[in-house]
Amino acid sequence: MSSAEPAASPAGRSTPLFVLRDLDGFFGLGANLLVVLLLIAGLCKSVVHLPDDLIFGRILPAAGLAVLAGNLFHALAAVVVSRSRPDVTALPFGINTIGLFIQIFFVMQPEYLAKLQINGDTDAGRRAAVEAAWTLGCLSCVGAAAVELLGSLLLAVIAGVRSGMGDKAAERTERFLLPRGPILASLGGIAIGFVAMTFAVDIWSHPMVAFLPFAVLLVTYLSRVRLPLGIPGELLALAVGAGLAWGQGLMGVDAVTASYAEVGFRRPNWWAETILGAVQPEDLLRAAAVFVPLGLYNLVGNIQNIEDAAQAGDRYPVAGGVIVNSLITAGTGLLGSPFPTTVYIGHGTWKGLGSRIGYGAMAGAVAAVLALTGSVAVIGHIIPVQAAYPVMLFVGAAITGQAFGSFPARHAPAAALALVPALAAWGFVLVRGTLLTTAGFINPEPEAPAPVSGATAAAKAPAPPATPGIPEAPGMGDKPATPEAPATDEGLETPVRVSRDGISIGQLVVAEQHRPGGGRVSGYLVHGLLVLERGFIFTSIFLAAIAANLIDRRFLGAAFWSLLAAGLTWVGLMHAYAVLIVKGPDGKEQYGNAVDHVFANLGFLDKSLAIPPGGDTANIFRAQELIAGYLMFAAVFLVLGVLRTGGRLEMLQTQTSDAENSAATRVL
């Protein structure tokens, strides 16, 4: 396929905007984009309980427009590069999959649950809760874009003065400001816990729909087998899954017909005034615990993917690409989508298939049409979401592998340590979800079994992560423990009773205060899981950075990261939490399940920061012991650093040669 407007190369040849092999890239990237759109529709409904008017009227139109804009930009960038390299391949672009999960589980769902428990489970309360969740999600998306933009501008400045600084000094400064290893290592924990595990559970729960598509992807991803006619593995997996579901009678024509009610053009609207006008200082700080690391993820991911393209011979301006991506992410947030965009992994794959300039623009255009017309709802009832789960399982596994690959081999323990806070957060999410369900809060009335189908099946799938911003219970710090629920040890220590009233996170936390070990669930301290879950992304980054510096015997670097961890804990971005106290069915106040960040130490700046949502009806844990712990870390490492600098520290010999140490990438 050739274009009417070819791009000219220096040799007089022309680089067509579209070639026949662009179809391979189009179907492959298009399948990925379709999966993400289906996930947005399914998870927004099942996890955050957003109504259709928000999903199909605000979020998807903005997301589709962003995908189209990004792919058009990268197609134009490829046209420019084609003037010197005719076989150039455009960078693939789409919604950040990990960012999607982070926003859903760690910004929007916690905000929804907290507001619902504060406002009450009424029609008005639910609407206020979903609006608050959507608003905070969009704010977080814009915040991540701002972090990415500032980071890219800073790196551009460093690149500009590189000649004056010298290559080594510039490289060292960049690694100090942007430690890629620890950032990617923390991403690995999210990928394995909240992405891979979520979908693995569903794959094994629906083997008759998901296993054959899983086998297709195993063959294409791991064995690198080329399918007949060059069919992308993702596309074949979706087709096979749909065939199996329809063949088993799990999909229905009536559901497809009913979904046509959502079809119709939706014009994206500018929501800047609504989103930014509703911002309170505490909202910004609560979201910062997520959007700061999310912005760093996007920054590092975009840089690495653009650099990977350069290794394949397609050299795109790194700073320019990252800056444009940050602007598109900010735009999509202000247009109503909480989900950031990014350059996708896979440029080398599409280049190997022979795709060139036009494949991304075609895929982006189709995704935009589906999103802007509400057609995603129809497709969600034609293709079972379970058929797409193997794709997401591989995404999670690939990102985790990339996290370990971002470190030298000797830093493997540092990468492993970074997984711990994320796995603790995953465990807390399961505990919290169970308690909310047994209390009749998430699923107030049991539903009759429904067939596995499209977008609604996504909702029935995993009951993913609850998240950051979790309140605490009395007895954790500022207030004495005066539980309304069992004041004795009875019923708090052993099997949690399943009742309509349930037992709450607050009660389990207080039980731990009454008797060490009394607040355990399956052997795990709920308070400990909660402490690790608060700001776990920062905790993962700091653990990895500290460990990597210690492996390299860079004690002063480890001390620096320990001090930074103490500072963020003092602010309230890590470990500190508040559990709200809510009114039970009998009208009495009781320990709740709604947890939130608390910035009690910043009350001198703004009194509202010291009081979490719910006012005084909350118990606050300031994490002061953890601040002291990080300071002790810093003191120990500082002393060792001084001793080593003075040559008074005896070091054990390692098996790593000096040449390897000097050649390997250092964290700081």
Residue ranges, per PLM feature:
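Membrane-helix interface "capping/anchor" motifs
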Residues: 76-85, 221-233, 352-358, 403-413, ...
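Low-complexity, proline/glycine-enriched hydrophobic segments characteristic of transmembrane helices
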Residues: 427-532, 575-621
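Hydrophobic alpha-helical transmembrane segments
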Residues: 137, 141, 201, 205-207, ...
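Membrane-embedded helical hairpins/re-entrant loop segments and their flanking transmembrane helices
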Residues: 13-17, 49-54, 69-88, 283-357, ...
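N-terminal alpha-helical transmembrane segments of multi-pass membrane transport
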Residues: 1-95, 108-112, 570-626, 636-660, ...
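Early transmembrane hairpin of solute transport permeases
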Residues: 12-218, 347-377, 381-392, 397-407, ...
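Flexible hinge motifs at transmembrane-helix junctions and intramembrane kinks/re-entrant loops
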Residues: 54-59, 216-304, 427-439, 450, ...
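Hydrophobic mid-bilayer segments of alpha-helices in multi-pass membrane transport proteins
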Residues: 64, 186-187, 210-215, 231-244, ...
